[in-house]
Structure formats: structure tokens, C-alpha cells
């Protein structure tokens, strides 16, 4: 039976959605209709939200799951009148944390995502700009400033991984696509050799690579299974020969790939 889930917040909804998605992912056999509802920050909005929740309960014949990070007690009480199963994330964790720290929390809306006074903000922006400027081998003369350089065949997940690490952790990650010419030379490009300690390889199953490339250039040599299989085989051989740590990205999310890379390379996050 399909269930409905709401991620409700008086801020952006990022925290409610992130934690809620992580919890729901543990129930793979249950399909969910998921709805994010940010900025529920007034009684009128809360009452309208209750109507949405109750409508979903009537439609589904079972109460929706509600993940909320509402700070205002009055708004939480209005939401609690709905026909939903509420998981109040802040009250679940803040109260015991207040007891342990012997201190009261600020109960500030959107506190963790505030830009003002956040010393990490500029580092995040600089890291994202670095990832964009050094994407796809476009520039190589700034590799000495990189924390990491991801290498692999075209369309194996290098760019989104670099951008995720930049956004989440302030990591300056460049990426370089290994081409057929590199494979024929049976060695790393010279520009990568002098940065060997920063290299990390991404590989991918050929059939998955074929599907991804087909969306970009259908019915081309570039997206053919034979070409994809050849490139993956040669790049994996190069990784082994050059002793480059690597991971197969096929069955992992960007979050998982990033975490595994940082652990493997021992790179410290600039902020957490």
C-alpha cells in the first residue's frame, strides 16, 4: 500500500526532508508519495496544511507520515490536530540534548542554514567555483590548489560528486575525463602524474554507462555498449597499473560516493 509523507518546516524544509528521506529509505517495500512543505510559519498556513494532511488520509485510507521541524509551539499544536502520524524532529532531539548540555536551545528558525555570520559560507562558494572552473579537464593549471582530482571515463559521475563535496564539505575537487587517447597511450596524462597523490578514480558498469550516454547522444559510437565496455575496461586497467584508488559508482548515491572518497583519501572536511 502506498503511503503519503509530508516534510513540513517553518524554514526551508531541508532538515525535515533530509532526515525524513533517510528514515523512509529503510522501508524499501513501501512506496511513498512525498511532499515538502516549507515556510509553514503562521497559524493560517498550519490550518491549511492540516486540510492537506486530512485529505491525504481520506484518500489513502491510512494516516500520512509527518516529519516536521516546526519551532513555534502554537503551530505544532495546530498540526497535531491533523489525522497524521507526527514525528517532531526538534522536540525528539532537542529536549534530551538540552538536559545533557544543561542549556536551553535558541529555537531559531532556519538556524543551521543561516548565511549571516556563517564563517563557512565563503569557503562553500569558493569550493563550488573551484569545482565549476576545473570541471571536465577544462583547466589543469590550478590542480596544485585542489584537495582531490577525480578521474574516470566521461559520464561516470565525476561532476556531481565534485559539486556535492564542494557544497557539503568545502572540498576543492577538480575532475579530469580520461579519453580514448589516454587509454591508447597506456599511461596517465602528464598533467595528472605530478598530482598522483590527489587522484581518485570513478568507474561504472558498462551497461549503466551506455544508458546514461544514450540520453546525451543516442545511437552514437560514444553511447554504444562496445565503446562503453572498452573504455571502462581500459580505465580500470589503468587504475590498477597506476595504483589509483577507485570506486564503482553504479550502485551508490553521490552522498555515499563522496563519503567513501573522503575516508579512502583521508581528506578532512573544511566544515561539518
Swiss-Prot record:
<feature type="binding site">
    <location>
        <begin position="152"/>
        <end position="159"/>
    </location>
    <ligand>
        <name>ADP</name>
    </ligand>
</feature>
<dbReference type="Pfam" id="PF03618">
    <property type="entry name" value="Kinase-PPPase"/>
</dbReference>
<keyword id="KW-0418">Kinase</keyword>
<keyword id="KW-0547">Nucleotide-binding</keyword>
<dbReference type="GO" id="GO:0016776">
    <property type="term" value="F:phosphotransferase activity, phosphate group as acceptor"/>
</dbReference>
<keyword id="KW-0808">Transferase</keyword>
<comment type="function">
    <text>Bifunctional serine/threonine kinase and phosphorylase involved in the regulation of the phosphoenolpyruvate synthase (PEPS) by catalyzing its phosphorylation/dephosphorylation.</text>
</comment>
<comment type="similarity">
    <text>Belongs to the pyruvate, phosphate/water dikinase regulatory protein family. PSRP subfamily.</text>
</comment>
<dbReference type="GO" id="GO:0043531">
    <property type="term" value="F:ADP binding"/>
</dbReference>
<dbReference type="GO" id="GO:0005524">
    <property type="term" value="F:ATP binding"/>
</dbReference>
<dbReference type="GO" id="GO:0004674">
    <property type="term" value="F:protein serine/threonine kinase activity"/>
</dbReference>
<keyword id="KW-0723">Serine/threonine-protein kinase</keyword>
<protein>
    <recommendedName>
        <fullName>Putative phosphoenolpyruvate synthase regulatory protein</fullName>
        <ecNumber>2.7.11.33</ecNumber>
        <ecNumber>2.7.4.28</ecNumber>
    </recommendedName>
</protein>
<dbReference type="InterPro" id="IPR026530">
    <property type="entry name" value="PSRP"/>
</dbReference>
<dbReference type="InterPro" id="IPR005177">
    <property type="entry name" value="Kinase-pyrophosphorylase"/>
</dbReference>
